[in-house]
């Protein structure tokens, strides 16, 4: 029993808990009240709401459909509903346009604090003033919001001038106030003409009077729907409802869209809440969602839903609503992804508004939408709809279509700040389709300007019309496709536009469909190309002049000017070549064609090159004229060079549409690419005239001009064909001016732009007259300057200087590289020709005269008038008696010439002279390439036949004379030339020894022997080595008398005979000036081997020391360079006089042949005197006497005869100086030189056999040679400045006297004069001379001056580096070898090595090799045969010649 009671209690408790929990779940009751005009049932309304499981309360929807919507019925239904059910919110909608319903609902909400939503009809209409306690919300827009949309519509269509008409309906003050505030604070140029408020309670007369004040075409109306009917009726009577007037009203006037009063005009614009896209069902659902969302937010925040008022009846208490009432949460609501918020006035914050238009069918048409504060209109141009009751229509407002194409029509966006178009632009509409599948889209307001827009504005003012402008939809000018026109032409043809203004080309096809005005712009077809960066050609440095100019320049230079200069100079009486021919300036420079070309070439390019200017007056005139030409030529070249070295931009050159690049584009690589914009006059022209060209260019068509410009710049297109006016503008405005039109805008198929009008339009004539007036007044020209002229056409690009890169100068470097390569080839060919081929060209290979030799000889013969005789080979025949005698005579002459080459020991040798003649090389043999005493390669001498070339020997005697640089010559005048058959390249010249005038004396040699005798150092008495001798040593030796060196047997005359003829050729120089080292020393010196002579069976071989003359000289003369162990020569038999008693070779030092007993080395004073003795560098043995003993031997008071060297005791001059006096025996001839000296020498030689001769002299002088080996020798001073190094034995010697007329001046002015006038007491000692032999019996021959040929190119002349056959070189003073001691059975042997690189063609000793005179004593017996050295001028490069016996005198 107890258990049953417990279970029952448990069930009951659980049931109580469940019942209590169910009561605690809140319920939200919402009432939906709708008028029965709507076809909707209560079930439909309940089905709109489904339970939302996310809510914490239950929603109970209470529906009520009413038939009566008058204010009393509405209040009754709402109060009854509230009394039966606790209502938390009400959703109310009706089908009326009575704003009184909204006012009643506003009153009920303020009394019951129940939130009420007016979603449709009168409940949603505008209320002017709501109660402060009102909780009434409306699905609609406020007065301010609708006024904003109305202003945006006027701004969209640029209706800036308007008027405002209102009634006394509540809210009109708010409407007027908002309009005024917006206009005053806006950047748009609004202009409100009138604000009119009509009182509809008064008579019609007052209303009409106020309406007459309106003059604007746009009117804003604010009133109720009933009042609007009255006002429209009155306005119609005043003509304010006609064509061109626009009325804009709010939703208050429109009301129920299903009810349209008759008085409403067609074209009425209304701003209403969106009923088309926002139906009653959607509004009911959104109303329920707003209330439930707000209740949920309140329950979440306060955990309670406030109890609603249960009855409308009772005491009216005006208490403030609680702070947590439901309507406070309904202000900011977002539901189902929609923003359903409300403003404080109870209107939606973002309402969906639409723009309605009452069309011709008297139906409301949706033409615009306002959403998210943005207005989108349907029509680009507002349709001018005329009311059906209007009798007349206004045709002055035109619809005009245009096409965007700069500079004629330029489209810009509106100003974002003002929302309108700026000044100088007009509004235009651009239509955008929503998608390609439908024609629906929206129009966007744009701003248009340009050349055609300015013309349109002028026409509008002149012709008096207004217009709406819009852009063509397909962006084309107009083309007929399948009998349907598109583009602007289609708009005009199908009367959607009255006219078309833009870059519309007039053509025949279009003229059939539309009418065109007169052309206002001349245009046609042009071609645009892009500039491309060019490259500089390698030959750009030649491009300043054309090829013909360069050819003419070289022709004038080489063939005309140079030849003329040469010819006039050659035949000029004062020219170079004439002076050579007449002998006025022998050996002087000649003026050749090459020098003429070089002179003119240097003048052209202004190079400072050494040139030889002509002397002739005529040739100087030609050169002066050429110099003037060179100035102009070089200036023109320099001025134009910079332009051609700059990288010019490359532009494709096209001559026209018929150009090959257009007609045959595949002929070019890559193919030429060109195109145009389709559906235009340009394409039509090309298609009709050039079908093949059109077929090719279709694949390169461009969508527009801008796309074409981009393709040109990026290289996708090579040329763009289009209207010339457009292309010229684009080229002028292009950034960087990279785009150009060919031919500076050359036009093909000239035509013009015109305005298209409908066929038979009444506007054609007025527009034509206006356009002609613009052209005549110059207004059209001003517009063209403003719009059609670009910056690239008016402004010149600034020329910027830039560095010339390697690319700019590549051509010049290529030329230099080619010149270097050509030089290398020429260098190789020159050496190949010189070493391998030239012998064949000169005839050596064939044995006959070569081609070059024959041509050169012929030219020389023609120029100089010299007859050339071909010397034929002598036939074999037996000699007659006279011929035999002549051969003997020639043989004797050769023997005589050879005897002069013998030294003292050879003359005193017991051997016969004929032995020397046969064994040794004769003078003429050496001339005839018969070799030297010993060949340089130690080959034995090969004897040549001397009989076949006797006459040739004589000719070669003079040929060996080198050229005289001072123009002294022997062979003057014209001489016959004969060809030597044995040597085909040698020409013989007949020589005359007769003296000629115009010869010139030699100058005084500046160098003294003391300077030449510097050596390694000096050894003082203590044996210490002193420093090298300075260059400031004694430089002058006393010379002979005035003409001591001028031989009467010489073949030239002295200068004092005809000195006046030579003054112009030679100027006196200050010979004491320091000269450069290159002038003081020779450019070459032969290498002399100074060796000991060896005996044939001698067991010992001494070392051979060689002085290398090729070493480069220095200013301070270094010691000679010696080379040991030079290759020995082949042994030969020498005379016995060269061996000592023990058969040893040169055991003691031999007596120097160039010393005299009078001038021994021991005659110098003590060491404090400036003259010092130095041992000879080739004296290897110890000396037999000391230095002090040697000095004592030199003191004496006597002198000698300068000719015969005999003793003259009364001479008080310098004891070391050569005597300037002659003895009485030598003065009897009265001549400077007597040929008898040579005869005496030869007679003496013939009076004694050679063996006895040598033996006799040796026995007589043997003791003297051993005692006097240290005596000072007297040498003839050698000339030439090219002396390399002094000899040791010449150092410290006193100077010789000077010769010629400058002797006194040199002695006075020379800084070394003190050495010449040293007091005798310092030079003479007490010791007597060791020698008492007299010199009176001795005779010495003087040498001749060198006699030079007159530069005959066919005579062998010898270089400065080559030895002379009968004279001495400039370095012979170093080459005086000492004589060996007196022994029998030894032959003289010497080895000579030439330092020149020249070698004869047969590989033997060079032709120019000669033997220096090694043993030439100054003091000999009466029978001595010798030849004295002589001096040559130091200012020239003359050689020293030995005295040769006169052939004519001997014969």
Curated annotation (Swiss-Prot):
One Pfam family of this chain: Lig_chan
InterPro entries named in the record: ANF_lig-bd_rcpt (IPR001828), Glu/Gly-bd (IPR019594), Iono_Glu_rcpt_met (IPR001508), Ionotropic_Glu_rcpt (IPR015683), Iontro_rcpt_C (IPR001320), NMDAR2_C (IPR018884), Peripla_BP_I (IPR028082)
GO BP annotations, alphabetical order: calcium ion transmembrane import into cytosol; excitatory postsynaptic potential; long-term synaptic potentiation; protein heterotetramerization; regulation of synaptic plasticity; response to zinc ion; synaptic transmission, glutamatergic
Signal sequence, start to end: 1-20
List of residues binding L-glutamate: 503, 505, 510, 681-682, 723
Biased composition (Basic and acidic residues): 1055-1073, 1100-1113, 1138-1149
Keywords: Calcium, Cell membrane, Disulfide bond, Glycoprotein, Ion channel, Ion transport, Ligand-gated ion channel, Magnesium, Membrane, Metal-binding, Postsynaptic cell membrane, Receptor, Signal, Synapse, Transmembrane, Transmembrane helix, Transport, Zinc
Coiled coil (residue ranges): none
Domain of life: Eukaryota
An example Gene Ontology CC term for this record: postsynaptic density membrane
SMART domains: Lig_chan-Glu_bd, PBPe
Subunit structure: Heterotetramer. Forms heterotetrameric channels composed of two GluN1/zeta subunits (GRIN1), and two identical GluN2/epsilon subunits (GRIN2A, GRIN2B, GRIN2C or GRIN2D) or GluN3 subunits (GRIN3A or GRIN3B) (in vitro). In vivo, the subunit composition may depend on the expression levels of the different subunits.
Family: Belongs to the glutamate-gated ion channel (TC 1.A.10.1) family.
UniProt remark on domains: Contains an N-terminal domain, a ligand-binding domain and a transmembrane domain. Agonist binding to the extracellular ligand-binding domains triggers channel gating.
Protein name: Glutamate receptor ionotropic, NMDA 2A
Organism: Xenopus laevis
């Amino acid at each position: 029993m107890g258990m049953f009671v417990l279970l029952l209690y448990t069930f009951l408790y659980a049931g109580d808990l469940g019942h209590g929990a169910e009561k605690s779940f809140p319920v939200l009751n919402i009432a939906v009240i709708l008028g029965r005009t709507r076809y909707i049932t209560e079930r439909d309304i309940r089905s709109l709401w489904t339970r939302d499981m996310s809510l914490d309360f239950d929603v109970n929807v209470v529906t009520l459909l009413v038939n009566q919507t008058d204010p009393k019925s509405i209040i009754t239904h709402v109060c009854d509903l509230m009394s039966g059910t606790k209502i938390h919110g009400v959703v109310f909608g009706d089908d009326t346009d009575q704003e009184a319903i909204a006012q009643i609902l506003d009153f009920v909400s303020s009394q019951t604090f129940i939130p009420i939503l007016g979603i449709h009809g009168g409940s949603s209409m505008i209320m002017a003033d709501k109660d402060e306690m009102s909780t009434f919300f409306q699905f609609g827009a406020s007065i301010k919001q609708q006024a904003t949309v109305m202003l945006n519509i006027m701004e969209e269509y640029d209706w800036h001038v308007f008027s405002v008409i209102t009634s006394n309906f509540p809210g009109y003050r708010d409407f007027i106030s908002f309009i005024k505030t917006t206009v005053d604070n806006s950047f748009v140029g609004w202009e409100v003409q009138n604000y009119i408020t009509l009182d509809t309670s008064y008579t019609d007369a007052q209303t009409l009077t106020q309406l007459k004040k309106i003059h604007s075409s746009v009117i804003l109306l604010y009133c109720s729907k009933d009042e609007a009917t009255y006002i429209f009726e009155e306005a119609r009577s005043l003509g304010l409802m006609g064509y061109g007037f626009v009325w804009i009203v709010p939703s208050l006037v429109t009301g129920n869209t299903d009810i349209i009063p008759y008085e409403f005009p067609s074209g009425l614009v209304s701003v209403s809440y969106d009923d088309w896209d926002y139906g009653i069902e959607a509004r009911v659902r959104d109303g329920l969602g707003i209330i439930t969302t707000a209740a949920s937010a309140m329950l979440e925040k306060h955990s309670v839903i406030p109890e609603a008022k249960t009855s409308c009846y009772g005491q009216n208490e005006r208490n403030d609503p609680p702070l947590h009432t439901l309507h406070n949460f309904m202000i900011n609501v977002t539901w189902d992804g929609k923003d359903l918020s409300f403003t404080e006035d109870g209107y939606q914050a973002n309402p969906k508004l639409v723009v309605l238009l009452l069309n011709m069918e008297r139906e409301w048409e949706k033409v615009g939408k306002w959403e998210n504060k943005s207005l989108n209109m349907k029509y680009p141009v507002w349709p001018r709809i005329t009311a059906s009751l209007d009798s007349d229509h206004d045709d002055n407002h035109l619809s005009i279509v245009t096409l965007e194409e700069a500079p004629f029509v330029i489209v810009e966006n509106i100003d974002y700040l003002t929302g309108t178009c700026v000044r100088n632009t007009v509004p235009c509409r651009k239509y955008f389709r929503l998608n390609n599948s439908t024609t629906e889209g929206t129009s966007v307001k744009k701003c248009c300007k340009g050349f055609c827009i300015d013309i349109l504005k002028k026409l509008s003012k002149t012709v008096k019309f207004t217009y709406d402008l819009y852009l063509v939809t397909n962006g084309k000018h107009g083309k007929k496709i399948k009998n349907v026109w598109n583009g602007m032409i289609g708009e005009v043809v199908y009367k959607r536009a009255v006219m078309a203004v833009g870059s519309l080309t007039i053509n025949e096809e279009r003229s059939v469909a539309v009418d065109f005005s007169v052309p206002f712009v001349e245009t046609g077809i042009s071609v645009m190309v892009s500039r491309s960066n060019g490259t500089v050609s390698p030959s750009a440095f030649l491009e300043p002049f054309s090829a013909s100019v360069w050819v003419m320049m070289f022709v004038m230079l080489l063939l005309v000017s140079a030849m003329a200069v040469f010819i006039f100079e050659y035949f000029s009486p004062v020219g170079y070549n004439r002076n050579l021919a007449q002998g006025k300036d022998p050996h002087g420079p000649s003026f050749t064609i090459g020098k003429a070309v070089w002179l003119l070439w240097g003048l052209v390019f202004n190079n400072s090159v050494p040139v030889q200017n002509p002397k002739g007056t005529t040739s100087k005139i030609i050169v002066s004229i050429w110099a003037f030409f060179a100035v102009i030529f070089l200036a023109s070249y320099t001025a134009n060079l910079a332009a051609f070295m700059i990288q010019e931009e490359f532009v494709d050159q096209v001559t026209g549409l018929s150009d090959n690049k257009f007609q045959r584009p595949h002929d070019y690589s890559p193919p030429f690419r060109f195109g145009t914009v389709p559906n235009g006059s340009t394409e039509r022209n090309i298609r009709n005239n050039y079908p093949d060209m059109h077929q090719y260019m279709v694949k390169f068509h461009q969508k527009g001009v801008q796309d074409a410009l981009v393709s040109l710049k990026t290289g996708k297109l090579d040329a763009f064909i289009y209207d010339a006016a457009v292309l010229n503008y684009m080229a002028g405005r292009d950034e960087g001016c990279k785009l150009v039109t060919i031919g500076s805008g050359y036009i093909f198929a000239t035509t013009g732009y015109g305005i298209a009008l409908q066929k038979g339009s009444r506007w054609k004539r007025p527009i034509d007259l206006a356009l002609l007036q613009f052209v005549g007044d110059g207004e059209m020209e001003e517009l063209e300057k403003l719009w059609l002229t670009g910056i690239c056409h008016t402004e010149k690009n600034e020329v910027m200087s830039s560095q010339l890169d390697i690319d700019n100068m590549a051509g010049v470097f290529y030329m230099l590289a080619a010149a270097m390569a050509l030089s290398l080839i020429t260098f190789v060919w020159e050496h190949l020709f010189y070493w391998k081929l030239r012998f064949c060209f000169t005839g050596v290979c064939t044995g006959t005269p070569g081609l070059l030799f024959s041509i050169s000889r012929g030219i020389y013969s023609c120029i100089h008038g010299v007859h050339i005789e071909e010397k034929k080979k002598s036939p074999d025949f037996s000699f007659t008696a006279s011929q035999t005698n002549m051969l003997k005579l020639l043989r004797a002459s050769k023997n005589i010439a050879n005897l002069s080459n013998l030294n003292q020991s050879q003359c005193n040798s017991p051997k016969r002279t004929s032995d020397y003649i046969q064994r040794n090389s004769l003078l003429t043999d050496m001339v005839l390439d018969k070799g030297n005493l010993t060949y340089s390669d130690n080959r034995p001498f090969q004897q040549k036949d001397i009989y076949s070339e006797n006459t040739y020997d004589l000719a070669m005697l003079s040929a060996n004379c080198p050229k005289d640089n001072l123009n002294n010559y022997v062979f003057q005048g014209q001489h016959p030339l004969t060809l030597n058959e044995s040597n085909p390249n040698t020409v013989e010249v007949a020589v005359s020894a007769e003296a000629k005038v115009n010869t010139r004396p030699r100058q005084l040699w500046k160098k003294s022997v003391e300077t030449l005798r510097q050596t390694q150092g000096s050894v003082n008495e203590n044996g210490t080595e002193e420093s090298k001798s300075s260059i400031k040593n004694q430089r002058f030796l006393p010379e002979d008398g005035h003409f001591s060196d001028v031989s009467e047997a010489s073949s030239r005359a002295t200068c004092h005979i005809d000195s006046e003829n030579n003054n112009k050729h030679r100027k006196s120089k200050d010979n004491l000036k320091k000269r450069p080292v290159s002038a003081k020393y020779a450019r070459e010196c032969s290498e002399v081997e100074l060796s000991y002579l060896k005996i044939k069976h001698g067991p010992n071989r001494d070392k051979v020391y060689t002085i290398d003359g090729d070493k480069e000289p220095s200013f301070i003369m270094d010691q000679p360079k010696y080379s040991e162990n030079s290759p020995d020569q082949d042994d030969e038999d020498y005379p016995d006089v060269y061996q000592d008693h023990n058969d040893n070779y040169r055991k003691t030092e031999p007596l120097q042949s160039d010393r005299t007993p009078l001038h021994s080395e021991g005659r110098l004073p003590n060491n404090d005197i400036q003259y010092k003795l130095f041992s000879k560098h080739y004296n290897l043995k110890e000396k037999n006497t000391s230095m002090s003993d040697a000095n004592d031997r030199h003191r004496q008071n006597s002198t000698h005869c300068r000719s015969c060297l005999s003793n003259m005791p009364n001479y008080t001059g310098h004891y070391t100086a050569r005597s300037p006096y002659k003895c009485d025996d030598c003065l009897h001839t009265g001549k400077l030189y007597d040929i008898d000296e040579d005869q005496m020498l030869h007679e003496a030689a013939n009076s004694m056999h050679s063996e006895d001769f040598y033996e006799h002299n040796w026995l007589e002088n043997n003791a003297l040679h051993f005692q006097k080996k240290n005596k000072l020798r007297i040498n003839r001073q050698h000339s030439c400045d090219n002396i390399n190094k002094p000899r040791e034995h010449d150092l410290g010697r006193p100077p010789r006297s000077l010769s010629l007329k400058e002797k006194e001046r040199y002695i006075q002015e020379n800084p070394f004069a003190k050495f010449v006038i040293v007091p005798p007491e310092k030079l003479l000692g007490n010791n007597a001379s060791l020698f008492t032999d007299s010199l009176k019996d001795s005779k010495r021959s003087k040498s001749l001056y060198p006699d030079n040929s007159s530069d005959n190119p066919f005579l062998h002349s010898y270089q400065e580096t080559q030895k002379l056959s009968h004279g001495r070189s400039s370095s012979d003073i170093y080459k005086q070898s000492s004589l060996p001691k007196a022994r029998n059975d030894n032959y003289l042997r010497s080895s000579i090595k030439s330092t020149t690189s020249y070698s004869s063609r047969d590989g033997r000793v060079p032709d120019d090799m000669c033997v220096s005179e090694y043993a030439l004593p100054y003091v000999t017996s009466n029978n001595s045969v010798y030849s004295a050295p002589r001096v040559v001028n130091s200012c020239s490069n003359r050689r020293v010649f030995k005295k040769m016996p006169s052939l004519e005198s001997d014969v």
